[in-house]
A protein has these predicted regions:
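Glycine-rich phosphate/ribose-binding loops and adjacent secondary-structure elements
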Residues: 177, 181-338
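Ordered alpha/beta subdomains of enzyme catalytic regions
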Residues: 1-204, 230, 303-392
Length: 392
């Protein structure tokens, strides 16, 4: 019995790779091409239908992988929004190809998965900028991915994450409520709510799950009476098989709580929350718990291609068909307006150079922002954009 996971050493040493990269390295070395230097660019190749922008993330992980090799790495800042219909280089790796060839698999996997999760989180957050969102998606993926998923969702704009390792990795105190299992074990919802209040530290918000045994409205009233002013919120997580009209159920709960003097109690909704349900419920829900739709989003496709080879000390543009040869620099005018020019050219309209040097011969030369700073960076850009049209 074992866990089928790769260790950090496996990843950093290039053992998590595709066999054709290993064979490529062997061929280049044996044929005297080990010293050939290249510039490889990473671009967004495709996005889910309806996506007008993506949020680039996963850079810190990718830099960790590449820092094991003597390469230069240029990149957009992590958390940067880019338009989905314009081929903007996200990252450029410069160095001997044999020094990083087997790392392409890991770098692409990191960037694609993290960018996909962060983009979905940002789309959902943009649909409810004045609402709170907590990431509940760890149970939707292999546990080895938990820190990455929490980080990607958080920097995408989510206000909290449920994973307990988030405090260690992100400096974010984990957020959560209570499971149905707690109430089922007690066999009585009021006893379970009171036990939570008696045992759990006071700084943890009292959010009662109110759809275990009875009608949601009745359980919400019981919770409010049992905990009074200490009750921060009620969570509705009704299974879709029994939900009926979720909006009407929530409105009924809200109306009744207000009528009985419990206007301070927040409404928390979870269970199958996606872009469309956020748009439909954001006027009556204070906090959303979002899981699978963020943990397993439609993918943002990112690819890597050699665009220049150094011959005799000169960089020579070259690429496979369908790709633009030659390394490029990236300049930004505004949130989604960019200008891409050949490496040594001058831009004509955009003058903020956003493709910056992060690794020099494998050594980090630029300070990386904290998760909190990345999140604020993403939110500052989202404020400049119209709401996305929900796609799920």
């Amino acid at each position: 019995v074992r866990l089928y996971i790769a260790s950090s050493d496996d990843i950093l040493q290039g053992r998590v790779t595709d066999i054709y990269f290993v064979r490529t390295k062997e061929i280049l070395i044996k044929k005297g091409l080990a010293d050939v230097r290249v510039r490889m660019e990473f671009h967004v190749n495709g996005v889910p239908r309806g996506y007008e922008w993506v949020v680039y993330s996963g850079l810190e992980d990718a830099l960790k992988v590449l820092s094991q090799r003597p390469v230069n790495v240029y990149s957009l800042p992590e958390g940067t929004l880019i338009p989905s219909n314009y081929p903007i280089p996200l990252m450029v790796i410069e160095g001997r190809y044999v020094d990083f060839v087997e790392l392409e698999t890991a770098v692409l996997g990191i960037l694609r998965h993290s960018t996909s999760v962060t983009t979905k989180a940002a789309r959902i957050k943009r649909l409810g900028m004045d609402r709170k969102f907590i990431f509940f998606g760890l149970r939707a993926a292999h546990p080895v991915l938990a820190p990455m998923l929490d980080r990607a969702a958080y920097i995408g704009g989510f206000d909290g994450v449920s994973g307990i390792m988030s405090e260690e990795y992100l400096g974010v105190k984990p957020s959560g409520t209570m499971p149905h299992a707690l109430i089922v074990v007690f066999g009585d919802n009021v006893e379970a709510w009171k036990a939570f209040d008696e045992v759990i530290p006071e700084d943890v918000p009292r959010i009662a799950l109110v759809d275990t045994f009875e009608d949601e409205r009745m359980e919400a009233i019981k919770a409010a009476k049992a905990l009074g002013k200490k009750l921060f919120g009620v969570r509705l997580d009704t299974p879709s098989s029994r939900r009926g009209n979720f909006r009407e159920i929530i409105m009924e709960v809200r109306w009744t709580l207000d009528l009985l003097g419990y206007k301070h109690v927040k409404i928390v909704a979870s269970g199958g929350i996606n872009e469309k349900s956020v748009q439909q419920l954001r006027d009556i829900v204070d906090i959303f718990g979002v899981g699978t739709s963020v943990a397993f989003p439609q993918p943002v496709d990112i690819g890597g291609d050699i665009v220049e080879v150094n011959k005799g000390g000169e960089w020579v543009p070259i690429s496979k068909r369908g790709k633009l040869p030659g390394a490029k620099k990236v300049y930004r005018c505004s949130t989604l307006e960019y200008e891409v020019v050949p490496w040594n050219s001058t831009p004509s309209k955009c003058f903020e150079d956003v493709l910056e040097l992060y690794l020099q011969e494998g050594r980090l030369v630029k300070k990386l922002p904290s998760p909190q700073e990345l999140r604020e960076y993403v939110l500052s850009q989202l404020k400049n954009l119209p709401e996305p049209t929900p796609t799920d």
